[in-house]
């Protein structure tokens, strides 16, 4: 399923002329890494469940006993079957523009879900995944908000348009603090999320041109719009 999720959007982009064939090269890089990680976790789980020697049995007993009283030890007995793989070395990742926000939502990481509020209606960040790219903007300035809306408008004729989720005054409300906690994002931050729910890039206070440049390889209409504006 993860293989399919990784490949589906890339195939769609290439087949619909939104990206060059080279985008498909990242599939092998990312999923070979994931396979190696899964094999390593599988070996770890097997050795934990069926210790091959006395040393492994001793370690397992110690971990099980400590896990009852120390939560930090519990990860040792977690086979990681419920957590997605990160793509830390993906060639698609952009340079991290907000390293101070912490590792949880860095480029290459699965974008954490967070519950937001649209008035009385709950909205989850993950509801926007699965089709186009998503820009998550946290309390953007008025000028940046206008620029991001313009970017989204420039992609409306694309097969899978860009979506902008604005959080803060006039937008969605981080009433439960989950976005702030899980993304480490402060006012002015912008996070760019791939269609498969992985973080492509993030910035603490970007210029609109930075965001436009990040999206241009996936939305030719954005590049065309920028060229037309420059000629005007």
Language model regions located:
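Active-site-adjacent scaffolding segments
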Residues: 5, 9-15
